[in-house]
Design a protein with these regions (language model features):
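Gram-negative and organellar
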Residues: 7, 65, 70, 99, ...
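N-terminal leader/linker segments that initiate helical-solenoid repeat arrays
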Residues: 1-37, 45-55, 59, 63-66, ...
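Amphipathic alpha-helical segments within well-ordered protein domains
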Residues: 21, 123, 339-340
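An N-terminal domain-start capping segment
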Residues: 15, 49, 83, 87, ...
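A generic tandem-repeat structural signature
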Residues: 45-128, 132-141
């Protein structure tokens, strides 16, 4: 039977199965042949038949320890781990130093995720048989499983400690190195991840795996051009010896790199070709869905994610990708469900957890307290104190409120005034792409000679009529409270406004605003502002462009407020921003806008203008953010009075709850 033993030892289980089956035709009661036949069946994927054979053998030879060991192992083949655990425990009571029993028990505990105990018994097995390759291999996989458990619980240091121990057992082991790199990726230690992937790539057979991973690291570092360069290199490295799975991974990464670099036409052609080559394959459908998200074709993206989930309900890309597309489309409840479904299959998966956290943040109640000091070259100065708050009762409905106290004075005229504005209202999502916001309140103004009370309002309808477009229709009723002289005039403005923005898939953007204003002093105003800009960088966000503004008043009352019959301003600007919403805890964020141009006031000669706006903030935690901001401008339209204007302020934002009110119940 030596030929059959060789088949088993070399992993040729089908040949072993056939060999021992033929032996049993001649010798049907041969114990060794039956035992080996059972092993061949089990190792070839027929675990249940193997178990039946071992049970029959145990009925004839109830004290045979080798048969008991094979029966215990067959329980592992059938993934009956709890039963295997109890059985191996009994075997170890019978023979505490049995190497196969210790090894089998350790593997059983590992499958049940009792990794600490599994390590204890694998070490006992290695004491019994020092340096045994099977035991060392089992220890490697126990460490990998244990490390993954630590990763799921967010303990990356403990995970790395275990993985580095693996490298002591198997120097430069590729699986271990890949897991180490993955921990660095998850913990955003991209430099160490990059170094680890480069180590993996030293071996020629792992070069493609290394390049594909290095392209991803470059993307995560915000270096998309480098990612495409690396991925292009990987495509050129493909040969006829490349395995099918690695070939697919490389093509997938190249398509992703094209998408990251906004080369949508090339990506689309490649994905169509892949779809013809691999019809209805999830990895290709995921690429197409991802491309459509980048192009804001969210409905098409959702359709592809649904096809993915039809093929595989547990798909990570399908569940979390769909959640992302639903969120972008305004279907927030469905987005929550899809993200939570991801966590059912991938416990504590970091991307899914972070997605839900970000979605929660959109609906978590908060309060913003703000104070500012401003002055101009007309001897006006003002102190302003403001508080605003939002409280969401659902993904559709939220309460809004604000209070503003402002004092203003003029050192030349001696005029002083104060104003108090209180507004309260609601925001309601009517449809997935339409939201109504309405605030109504009271403005109380007090000068040295009079007190005024006026109704104020802020009502707007925000829509997304087409992809990459936003449209706002609004009405605002407000009091001119820039300085004491204006407050004394008790000028009420009724503003009817339209805001329209258009983004494109080729980095160009356009924003236009129109105001038509009527005032209780019988004056009217028309204001048009338009901005054409180009997005130069994504991280940090950097854009530059040109602005144009036109203002005209029906009546000119320059002694009271800036009210030209015609006013035109042109400027070029750049804006750089690190958004507070993407900033991590204990990190800084910032924004700087600088602009320069010319303004034409009625028939006067052109005047040079400048505008600087900046802010610097720090995120102490996910719940508290402090921001210092300032601005300076000599553009006449920057203030109601047409003066050069400077403002500095401090803003503190605090999230009252840790998560949305409607998700705490």
């Amino acid at each position: 039977m030596n030929e059959g033993f060789t088949y088993l030892e070399t992993g040729k289980y089908k040949q072993a199965e056939t060999f021992f089956e033929n032996i049993l035709i001649t010798y049907p009661k041969n114990k060794t042949a039956k035992l080996c036949y059972g092993r061949a069946l089990g190792l070839n994927g027929n675990g249940e038949r193997a178990t039946t054979i071992f049970i029959n053998l145990l009925e004839r030879y109830p004290q045979d320890f080798e048969i008991k060991l094979n029966y215990a192992e067959s329980l592992l083949w059938n993934e009956n781990y709890n039963k295997a655990k109890d059985y191996y425990k009994n075997l170890l009571e019978e023979k505490p130093n049995s190497f196969p029993a210790l090894l089998g028990y350790a593997n059983t505990l590992s499958n049940l995720k009792f990794f600490n105990e599994a390590l204890e018994f694998i070490d006992k097995a290695l004491l019994t048989s020092p340096g045994n390759l099977n035991a060392l291999t089992s220890k490697k996989y126990i460490n990998l499983g244990y490390a993954n458990q630590y990763v799921q619980n967010g303990d990356y240091k403990a995970a790395l400690k275990l993985l580095l121990k693996n490298l002591q057992l198997f120097k430069k082991d590729i699986e271990t190195l890949q897991n180490i790199a993955n921990v660095y990726l998850i913990s955003s230690d991209f430099s160490k991840a990059e170094a680890t992937y480069k180590t993996i790539g030293i071996s020629p057979q792992n070069k493609l795996t290394s390049l594909n991973s290095l392209a991803l690291v470059s993307h995560l570092k915000g270096k998309n051009k480098k990612a495409l360069e690396i991925s292009s290199k990987a495509i050129n490295y493909i040969s006829n010896k490349t395995s099918e799975s690695l070939l697919q991974q490389t093509k997938e990464r190249y398509a992703q790199a094209l998408i990251w670099n906004r080369k949508y036409k090339k990506a689309d052609i490649l994905i169509q070709k892949l779809n013809n080559e691999y019809p209805n394959k999830n990895w290709v459908l995921s690429l197409r869905a991802s491309l459509n998200i980048y192009k804001s074709n969210f409905e098409k993206s959702i359709n592809d994610y649904n096809r993915i989930l039809k093929n595989d309900t547990t798909s990570f890309d399908g569940n979390l990708g769909k959640a992302n597309a639903l969120k972008a489309s305004g279907y927030f409840i469905e987005s929550y469900k899809s993200a939570e479904n991801t966590l059912k299959f991938y416990k504590n998966q970091k991307d899914a957890v972070n997605f839900i956290k970000k979605l929660d943040k959109s609906f978590t109640p908060f309060v913003v307290a703000e104070s500012s000091y401003s002055f101009d070259n007309g001897n006006n100065k003002a102190y302003s104190y403001k508080a605003t708050s939002e409280f969401s009762f659902s993904t559709k409905f939220k309460l809004l409120g604000s209070y503003n106290y402002r004092t203003t004075s003029n050192s030349l005229s001696g005029l002083k005034a104060t104003s108090n504005n209180v507004l309260g209202g609601v925001s309601y999502q009517l449809l997935h792409n339409i939201k109504l916001k309405s605030l109504i309140g009271l403005a109380s103004s007090k000068t040295e000679t009079n007190t005024f009370n006026q109704l104020v309002a802020d009502i707007s309808l925000l829509t997304k009529p087409f992809k990459l477009q936003n449209l706002e229709l609004g009405y605002k009723r407000e009091i001119q409270n820039f300085n004491a002289a204006l407050l004394a005039e008790n000028i009420v403005q009724n503003n009817y406004l339209i805001n329209y923005s258009l983004n494109t898939n080729f980095r160009l953007g356009w924003f236009t605003q129109y105001y038509y204003t009527t005032q209780n002093d019988k004056n009217t105003r028309n204001l048009i502002f338009t901005s054409l800009y180009y997005n130069i960088l994504e991280k940090p966000s950097l854009k530059a462009g040109v602005n144009y503004q036109n203002i005209s008043f029906k009546n000119q009352v320059p002694t009271i407020y800036f009210s030209p019959s015609k006013f035109n301003a042109y400027e070029v600007f750049f804006n750089i921003i690190k958004d507070e919403n993407i900033t991590k805890e204990n990190e800084w964020f910032y924004e700087l806008t600088a602009a320069s141009g010319f303004q034409y006031i009625e028939n006067s000669k052109k005047q040079r203008t400048y505008r600087i706006q900046s802010k610097l903030g720090y995120k102490f935690s996910e719940r508290s953010i402090l921001t210092l901001y300032g601005s300076k401008s000599n553009i006449a339209s920057a203030t109601a009075a047409g003066f050069t204007f400077t403002e500095i302020g401090l803003r503190f934002k605090w999230f009252i709850l840790r998560k949305p009110f409607f998700r705490k119940r």
